[in-house]
């Protein structure tokens, strides 16, 4: 796995911890935060993660989108990482995961989806280009 982090500097940030009853409550609260940002700024940029934890959040967001309550048409996304050596068509890739669990279920412009290329010949150049695109 590789991530697009080259000239990373750390800054002090405060984190608010939110306690929830269960996974469903956590998923809905996370979806509320994301949807509020999209409503506030329809062309916002989201940083997205993979794995089992955000699936409930993605499901809730897709449900609101299907009902017409949330519009992803102007949203851009950047995924955090990708497995090196895996094609985007490989079911084990994060690219595949995101389309299967989220992007195929919302009205996002596919040109606004950004995921690292796991088959990039030059991973340093891939990460540098990704980092520049995020800026």
Regions found by a protein language model. Name each.
Residues 1-3:
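Intrinsic low-complexity, disordered N-terminal segments enriched in polar/charged/small residues
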Residues 10, 14, 70-135:
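Ligand-binding beta-strand-loop-alpha-helix segment within the catalytic cores
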Residues 30, 57-60, 88-90:
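Short, glycine/acidic-enriched capping/hinge loops at junctions between secondary-structure elements
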Residues 31-39, 62, 66, 99-103, ...:
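Generic structural signal for well-ordered alpha-helical scaffold segments
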Residues 40-65:
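Glycine-rich N-terminal segment of FAD-binding domains in flavoprotein oxidoreductases
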């Amino acid at each position: 796995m590789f991530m697009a982090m080259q000239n990373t500097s750390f800054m002090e940030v405060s984190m608010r911890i939110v306690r929830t009853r269960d996974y469903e409550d956590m998923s809905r609260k996370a979806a509320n935060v994301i949807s509020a940002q999209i409503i506030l700024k329809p062309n916002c940029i989201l940083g997205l993660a993979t794995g089992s934890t955000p699936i409930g959040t993605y499901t809730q967001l897709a449900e609101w989108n299907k009902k017409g309550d949330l519009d992803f048409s102007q949203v851009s996304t950047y995924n955090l990482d990708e497995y090196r050596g895996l094609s985007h068509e490989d079911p084990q890739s994060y690219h595949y995961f995101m389309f299967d669990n989220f992007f195929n279920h919302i009205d996002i412009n596919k040109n606004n989806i950004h995921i690292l290329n796991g088959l990039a010949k030059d991973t340093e150049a891939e990460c540098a280009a990704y980092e520049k695109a995020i800026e």
